[in-house]
Amino acid sequence: MGDCGCSGASSCNCGSGCSCSNCGSK
């Protein structure tokens, strides 16, 4: 469970050790 699934500008699923552009670095 350390995946990042971004589908959309407001639909970001940030897990452990994931850094999305629209999500904060977690």
Swiss-Prot record:
Residues 1-26 are annotated as: Disordered. GO terms for molecular function: metal ion binding. Keywords: Copper, Metal-binding, Metal-thiolate cluster. Cu(+) 6 binds at C14, C18. Residues 1-14 have a biased composition (Low complexity). Induction: By copper. The keyword Metal-binding applies. Cu(+) 5 binds at C12, C18. The keyword Phosphoprotein does not apply. Cu(+) 4 binds at C12, C20. Cu(+) 2 binds at C6, C23. Cu(+) 3 binds at C6, C20. Residues 15-26 have a biased composition (Cys residues). Cu(+) 1 binds at C4, C23. The seven cysteines bind six copper (cuprous) ions. Belongs to the metallothionein superfamily. Type 8 family. This is Metallothionein. It comes from Neurospora crassa (strain ATCC 24698 / 74-OR23-1A / CBS 708.71 / DSM 1257 / FGSC 987). The lineage of its organism: Eukaryota, Fungi, Dikarya, Ascomycota, Pezizomycotina. The gene is cmt.
